Structures are given as structure tokens and as C-alpha cells.
From Swiss-Prot:
Residues 1-19 are cytoplasmic. This is Galactose-3-O-sulfotransferase 3. The gene is Gal3st3. The keyword Magnesium applies. Residues 421-431 have a biased composition (Low complexity). It comes from Mus musculus (Mouse). The chain crosses the membrane at residues 20-40.
Length: 431
């Protein structure tokens, strides 16, 4: 072979080796960057798993003015407890009901600022049951208040309502053998619009949100669209009970709170023996048909919820939700032992943690503190699991004392047992 051809062949081989080497180095570099992508946030557009830190730098000030519309049978008691504990840690005033309203703001009447106990005004937060009235809430709350609520899938919610209020709602009491299936087979045979506690038997979500629960989207689609528009105008976040931890991640980010601020113990949960393990498909369809207004609300806000998660970065939200669950389990173990379990009220020794029982047919579960505990940690754990009525009573006494109404210090352990529901509350006179 001529010398010139030999030199050309050697040059070609060297170039091929360089290309191969560069290709290997390039692949290795890209592989390393992808591997580090979930930990490095230097180029978020290329690596979507790069998530914002839990604590912003510089940190935003935590938002203190929050109004939570506590809807019925939607995990609202757990959210309320989160807000109550945050308010206590930051010495905030929580709006609480006038004594004649008991522990709700004279529900099911439309909310009025007159229903708020004078010792708890002006408030930073509000989280007790009420029927939404925008004008009255804006009259009461600070101008920078962030409004939040929570919805639950209507079939599951209705099963819970039917079980929980079976002894109080006449429409449910009329049903033979307290059968949900019998009621949903012919709901008009048992339901009477406008009677005592009727709102628990038909479109309860719509009623809580201030809507007309007797309207049907099948007959008036414009009404549902208008109600959705009203909710969107007011509420910065509509949480979804089925995705509770993801909802708390969005809430934490909205309010610029820390992860520790949204840790929780599950409250007001029924025992397995008091609920259907699964709702048959036909029964779920019947429940959604009967509660069509609620179904329309839920379907819309469930869709907007996931669009919001997508904007925040679904992988990032899921990662933070996992971190929340892990931190929550550590907290529960520290407070309630290595294997914290929900217990029937009869097995809870600490009276302040015994949840109210709506009837003999329904067991509401709770936690108990290990014996021998004392000190700040015990008090924090007590509040973590404290039922709504006891916590509301405690906060009212504490805020009265802060306002000079009472001078004797109140103990967190000094809580009377909750009273049963008897009748509609009276309207308080004056302010």
C-alpha cells in the first residue's frame, strides 16, 4: 500500500476512536445529570423533578388570615384542628360561635357576623361549621383573608351523612331498617324540603356553600355554572378529601407555612363497623344522581385541583406529600406510641380526647395518650388529637382570658364533654 494511503487509513481510525470516546463521555455526562436531576434545581426546564425547597429563601412571611369553610363529612374536622393549632402557636384570634349557637355558627342558618362570640372578634381565623355568606364573612374577616374549603366525592360523602345523621334527619329516620339502598331507591318518598335538618339529605355541599340545594343541574345547567363561578371568585383553594395530603401540600404553599404546620392526626373517623367498606357501583350512581348538584361541584373542582397540581409539578407535589406522611407518622409515634391506633371512645381513658358519638349505631374513633405523660409535649399531643367540641371550648376560654373576661388560667385538660345535638340553635340577640 502506498505510504499516503497508509497515513490516511491511520488518520481515519484515530478519528473514529475519538468519536467513540466523545460519544461515551457524552452519554456518561447526560446520565449523571439525569441521575442528579431530582436533587439539583439548576435547570428546572430540563429536569422537571427539581422541586422547590420546603423552606423558601428568602422565606415568605406566613399568611395568618384564613377562613376555612368547614363542609360536612369531608375531613373538615382534621383541617380545622390544623388551623386551631397554628393559631395557638402564633397567638392568633380564632372566631368561635356565640354560646347560643353551640359549636357551629348557628348552622343551618345563613352565616351572620352576629353569630360570632364577642370575645373572639376581630378574628384572624375562622374554621367552624357555617352556611356560607360572602358579605357577612367579608364584614367579619380581615381584607387579606385567604378563603379555603374542602369537597368530597358525593357518593362517599352521602353514605357518611346517612350514617352520621341517621338519628337527627327526619328523611333518614323514615327509612325502614336504616337502609341507604332503600332511601336511594326512592328518595322523594322520604325527603321533605325545608324540614328540620333536611339539608343533610340532599346536596349538602351546595347548601354549605350557600347554594340552593333544591336546584337540579339537569333542569338548570346555568345554576350550577353560576354556583361554580361564585365559589371560584372567593376561594383560593378547594381541597379534595380523597387527596388529602396533596391538598395540604397546596395549602402549605399557598399560605407559605412549614411542613410541620400541616401535620395532623385523623379526626372524627368512623369505625369500620359503622361504614360501608366499599359502595356498590349502582348505589354510588344513585347517590350522585340524587345529589346531582354536589356531583357537578365535585367533578369541576376535582378537575381544577389536578390542573393546579400539574402547574405546581405533580412529581414535586407527590414527593412533598410522601415527606408529609413520613413526618406525620413520626409525630404520631412520638405522641401515641410505637403503633398508634384509632380507638373507640369507650376505650379512650383521656376524657378530653373522647369524640362525640352521634348515636349508638355509629362509633367515632379517636386516640389516647400513653399513661404517665406530662409537660409541653403531652399538651401538644393532646391538642393534635382533641375533638372539635373540646378544642372549641378550650380556645373560647383561653381567648376570653386573653381579653380580660376571665382571670383564672384554664388548663387544656379542663374540658366538659360535648353536648348532643338537640334542636336548631337560637339566634343570638345583638352583638
Amino acid at each position: 500500500m502506498p505510504p499516503i494511503l497508509q497515513r490516511l487509513q491511520q488518520s481515519t481510525k484515530m478519528m473514529s476512536h475519538r468519536k467513540i470516546l466523545l460519544l461515551v463521555l457524552g452519554c456518561s455526562t447526560v446520565s449523571l445529570l439525569i441521575h442528579q436531576g431530582s436533587q439539583l434545581s439548576w435547570y428546572p426546564k430540563l429536569f422537571p423533578l427539581s422541586c422547590p425547597p420546603l423552606r423558601e429563601s428568602p422565606p415568605r412571611a406566613k399568611h395568618m388570615a384564613v377562613a376555612f369553610l368547614k363542609t360536612h363529612k369531608t375531613a373538615g374536622t382534621t383541617v380545622q384542628n390544623i388551623l386551631f393549632r397554628f393559631a395557638e402557636r402564633h397567638n392568633l384570634t380564632v372566631a368561635l360561635p356565640h354560646p347560643s349557637c353551640e359549636h357551629q355558627f348557628c348552622y343551618p342558618r345563613n352565616f351572620s357576623a352576629h353569630f360570632v362570640h364577642p370575645a373572639t372578634r376581630p378574628p384572624h381565623m375562622l374554621a367552624s361549621h357555617l352556611r356560607f355568606d360572602r358579605a357577612e364573612l367579608e364584614r367579619l374577616m380581615p381584607p387579606d383573608t385567604i378563603y379555603v374549603t374542602i369537597l368530597r366525592e358525593p357518593a362517599a360523602m352521602f353514605e357518611s351523612l346517612f350514617s352520621y345523621y341517621n338519628q337527627y334527619c327526619p328523611a333518614f329516620r323514615r327509612v325502614p331498617n336504616a337502609s341507604l339502598e332503600t332511601f336511594l331507591r326512592a328518595p322523594e318518598a322520604y325527603y321533605r324540603p325545608g324540614e328540620h335538618f333536611a339539608m343533610f339529605a340532599h346536596n349538602t355541599l351546595a347548601y354549605d356553600l350557600g347554594g340552593d340545594n333544591e336546584r337540579s343541574p339537569r333542569d338548570d345547567a346555568a345554576y350550577l355554572a353560576g354556583l361554580i363561578r361564585q365559589v371560584e371568585e372567593v376561594f383560593s383553594l378547594v381541597m379534595i378529601a380523597e387527596y388529602f395530603d396533596e391538598s395540604l401540600v397546596l395549602l402549605r404553599r399557598l399560605l407559605a407555612w412549614d411542613l410541620d404546620d400541616v401535620l395532623y392526626a385523623k379526626l372524627n373517623a368512623r369505625a369500620a363497623s359503622s361504614r360501608l367498606a366499599t359502595i356498590p357501583e349502582a348505589l354510588a350512581r344513585a347517590a350522585r344522581t340524587w345529589n346531582a348538584l354536589d356531583a357537578g361541584l365535585y367533578d369541576h373542582f376535582n378537575a381544577t385541583f389536578w390542573r393546579r397540581v400539574a402547574r405546581a409539578g405533580r412529581a414535586c407535589v407527590e414527593r412533598e406529600a410522601r415527606e408529609l406522611r413520613e413526618a406525620r407518622q413520626r409525630l404520631l409515634r412520638r405522641c401515641f406510641g410505637d403503633e398508634p391506633v384509632l380507638r373507640p371512645a369507650a376505650q379512650i381513658r383521656t376524657k378530653q380526647l373522647q369524640p362525640w358519638q352521634p348515636s349508638r349505631k355509629v362509633d367515632i374513633m379517636g386516640y389516647d395518650l400513653p399513661s404517665g405523660g406530662a409537660g409541653p409535649t403531652t399538651e401538644a399531643c393532646l391538642k393534635l388529637a382533641m375533638p372539635e367540641v373540646q378544642y372549641s371550648n378550650y380556645l373560647l376560654r383561653k381567648q376570653k382570658r386573653r381579653g380580660g373576661v376571665r382571670s383564672r388560667p384554664e388548663s387544656v385538660l379542663d374540658n366538659p364533654p360535648p353536648r348532643p345535638i338537640r334542636a336548631l340553635p337560637r339566634i343570638p340577640q345583638g352583638t
